[in-house]
Amino acid sequence: MDLPPDAGAHTAFPLLGMTLSEFARQKLPANAPMPGGGHDHGESVPIPTAQAHRDFIAVVSESLANECQEPRQMVRMVDITFESSPVGVSTWTVPEASGNFCGRGGRFGSHSSNENFTSIYYGRVLFVTFFNAGVRALDVRDPFNIKEIGYYIPATTANTDRRCVGEGASQNCKVAIQSNNVEVDDRGYVYVVDRANTGLHILELTGAARKVANFGP
């Protein structure tokens, strides 16, 4: 798939032109590469320049194995201000002990983020699915310090499929939520689809988490 550099897709979400006061007085050395083009602080910006505006991409790894039988998959934030020299700056994952997720059944770990660039959430809140840990709302205003500000784990229903580990007589199966994909719309509603046949959940951000978003007056 051929995508422009400012487009996200499923497991990669660009956060371009993020204003970080920490870098307001940072200068570039004369031999530094040019920042990436195509956006508001790209090729037209002279060198040296203050680097308060930086570009990032949220890379969301996908869990594939049930009950933690693989390396932990998580959200990784990468600084791509200089596209030829990407730098990882932070990671985030749901703490396993917060819900005994390795023992709940099914997959545990990240899968995908929202893809809509609505101004309500862009550069502020990123939603990421974590299979049996539901969907997580992350404050990404400071990509160096990602913070969770909300989450929702749907309840299983009679329609929720089992997820198994092992084979034959040693096979063990459990019914588990598997929040698979998440998307938002331009009104701010959040849509979460379950991989284990539980269905679609429509959510609304509330409380302190809603104040991080940009719903306007």
Which residues does each PLM region occupy?
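Feature marking well-ordered beta-strand scaffolds used for ligand recognition
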Residues: M1-P217
